[in-house]
Amino acid sequence: MSNRNNNKLPSNLPQLQNLIKRDPPAYIEEFLQQYNHYKSNVEIFKLQPNKPSKELAELVMFMAQISHCYPEYLSNFPQEVKDLLSCNHTVLDPDLRMTFCKALILLRNKNLINPSSLLELFFELFRCHDKLLRKTLYTHIVTDIKNINAKHKNNKVNVVLQNFMYTMLRDSNATAAKMSLDVMIELYRRNIWNDAKTVNVITTACFSKVTKILVAALTFFLGKDEDEKQDSDSESEDDGPTARDLLVQYATGKKSSKNKKKLEKAMKVLKKQKKKKKPEVFNFSAIHLIHDPQDFAEKLLKQLECCKERFEVKMMLMNLISRLVGIHELFLFNFYPFLQRFLQPHQREVTKILLFAAQASHHLVPPEIIQSLLMTVANNFVTDKNSGEVMTVGINAIKEITARCPLAMTEELLQDLAQYKTHKDKNVMMSARTLIHLFRTLNPQMLQKKFRGKPTEASIEARVQEYGELDAKDYIPGAEVLEVEKEENAENDEDGWESTSLSEEEDADGEWIDVQHSSDEEQQEISKKLNSMPMEERKAKAAAISTSRVLTQEDFQKIRMAQMRKELDAAPGKSQKRKYIEIDSDEEPRGELLSLRDIERLHKKPKSDKETRLATAMAGKTDRKEFVRKKTKTNPFSSSTNKEKKKQKNFMMMRYSQNVRSKNKRSFREKQLALRDALLKKRKRMK
């Protein structure tokens, strides 16, 4: 009886829905019956909107599923559901409210609702105290905006939504404002809304009185695109087999020439895939897209000075201000005295504060302002009463600050710091050497003669610029090396023809011919030729090459290598005791942001005390798994096998058994040979 009831169409909505989708005109009467039933349920719901109604929820989902089949009857249905939600969303039953939202999402996926009005309604629903609903709406909003901008940027919809979000960020409801901010941040990270307007709307959240909103906005601006790119690269590299997987597969399989060839082929394919260049993402960091960074930084500093938030939030504010000042080269002179208050060795997170001081330094800041900052670091950190680690951190911070603002360093302070080159602590000694090495390239004249080292081409060409002076060149420095190399290549081509003709004659002998790659010798000859040229002639050649030809990436790589070689090669006229040094061309360029490793770099790790070593050893033991194979039985209650019983049996009971007595043992001669082989093997190892 129940089965027959389930097949009746008026009471079985899923079956009716399935049939209507197959043939809408055939079931129009059943649809109209359900539609009238839906209307009467809506009228009842309006009288008591706070009461749950399972029947109405089923009818709303049914209508949403078949709305595309009867557009003439259900043209006003989406607007009706939206009105019910917008008027009663605060008092609605949570399950019924979720059903209404799902029905609207279904209608939007069928493109039966305008996205702007629906998304505005969903943003308003963020005010509801329903975590599951907020999560569902958040996912739909991000996905829908992504689909809207999939083929091309839909600026009409984007502008309307961005303006609406700007008002939502200032909403009195903190939850709604936070969710709206999360949507904007997610859209920026997914490269959907990566324009300046989105970034400048998010800047308003940095002045929110709600801590969660403030922290979310600061975290967004402190995020780095480079890190995200590396993460995405590492995620993509995890897909598919690695070289280790292929080697393990070969080692565990059958050893044959066919399998070996398969392995080599697979390794080649893997290498080729790794070498494939991915499309570059031309995505600036959000800090670059701020319209008025000077005004933004001043407001942030004012907020920081009267901030009553936790210390971690203050650190984030300091970090953002320092990045703004360093990247945009702003004038924010009150920021440096503010940082000086925290520059004490006992200060919490002092290495990060030193990093912020270095980030906020640039060549346009007047040297007098940075000088007071340097003296504070030197007086508080680089003194003999402090430990070696504290002194090292102080010298590293001074080095990073002066690398960005060289004019701030005084000759007296530099000479004092250079004396630590012979300090007993290796970390202090090495950090002082790095500071000396920096000034050998920046301004060797400030160092004492014994610390200047052997003069190189780069140190002779180095020139100290005055405050505010620009060094504008009308040529590419180092471009003169290209023309010389071109001539050398022409000569090498002629030599190449001669060598090939010789090799053809000698090929009949069937002997191997040694081919000598003389790239190192060529580079030495090029550097000799350039050294013999006067400086004026070099500049003229570089200017001629820069204006007469289009330089390729390979040309720029050669120029960069030549400029790096200048720092190694001795100056012309001096006795060249140095050998030619090969330069690593894969060296990563230094970014515009500093890393905490630059400040905390210790060349020698400090010894850990006994308690720390014991704690690490004990932690390792707890995490370690037993290297024993667990005996697993199909039936845990079954008895042990005869084989297991044999292993566990006492030897004295097995001693006189037939199996032991009839066992084949090694003869005396076999034992002699085994001993001899073992002794020979041991002697080889001793050698």
From Swiss-Prot:
Gene Ontology biological process terms, A to Z: protein transport; ribosomal large subunit biogenesis; ribosomal large subunit export from nucleus
Cellular localization per UniProt: Nucleus, Nucleolus
Keywords carried by this UniProt record: Coiled coil, Nucleus, Phosphoprotein, Protein transport, Ribosome biogenesis, Transport
Coiled coil: 253-315
Tissue expression notes: Highly expressed in testis, kidney, spleen, brain and fetal tissues. Also expressed at lower level in heart, lung, liver, small intestine, ovary, uterus, mammary gland and placenta.
Listed GO CC annotations: nucleolus; nucleoplasm
Entry keyword Phosphoprotein: yes
Residues bearing the modification Phosphothreonine: 552
Pfam families linked: SDA1_C, SDA1_dom, SDA1_HEAT
Keyword Iron-sulfur part of the UniProt annotation: no
Residue ranges, annotated region (Disordered): 483-525, 604-669
Positions carrying Phosphoserine: 232, 234, 236, 585, 595
Domain of life from the UniProt record: Eukaryota
Biased segments, Acidic residues type: 490-512
Note in the entry: DAZL and PUM2 bind its 3'-UTR mRNA, suggesting that these proteins may regulate its translation.
Function, as annotated: Required for 60S pre-ribosomal subunits export to the cytoplasm.
Family, as annotated: Belongs to the SDA1 family.
Official protein name in the record: Protein SDA1 homolog
Organism: Homo sapiens
